[in-house]
């Protein structure tokens, strides 16, 4: 049975973590509080020093997430986590083997 890992945060770190876990045969689930994946990258124009448009990077990451069939839960926050899993605001508990916090920065 595949291990299930909940990733809290759907920014670049969360998406990259999910992709790496999927490559290792793990079943990742991304929980993102916003309506779409991307985190701070959604508000950036270009990346330094290459001046690659941020939208290109974001589009590619989202494509790879979808291609891998990684479960994504947007507009969802984690209220807490324990040995049983991650608790959602509606009281549901998402069972998992591990939790990775990729909550980003402000």
Task: Name every feature range the model reports, one short phrase each.
Residues 3-68:
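Beta1-alpha1 glycine-rich phosphate/pyrophosphate-binding loop at the start
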């Amino acid at each position: 049975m595949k291990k299930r890992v909940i990733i809290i945060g759907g920014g670049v770190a969360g998406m990259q973590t999910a992709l790496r876990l999927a490559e290792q045969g793990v079943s990742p689930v991304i929980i993102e509080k916003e309506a779409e994946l991307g985190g701070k990258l959604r508000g950036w124009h270009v990346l330094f020093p290459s001046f690659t448009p941020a939208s290109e990077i974001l589009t590619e990451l989202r494509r790879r997430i979808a291609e891998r069939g990684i479960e994504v839960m947007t507009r969802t926050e984690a209220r807490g986590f324990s040995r049983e899993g991650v608790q959602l605001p509606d009281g549901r508990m998402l069972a998992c083997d591990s939790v990775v916090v990729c909550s980003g920065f402000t």
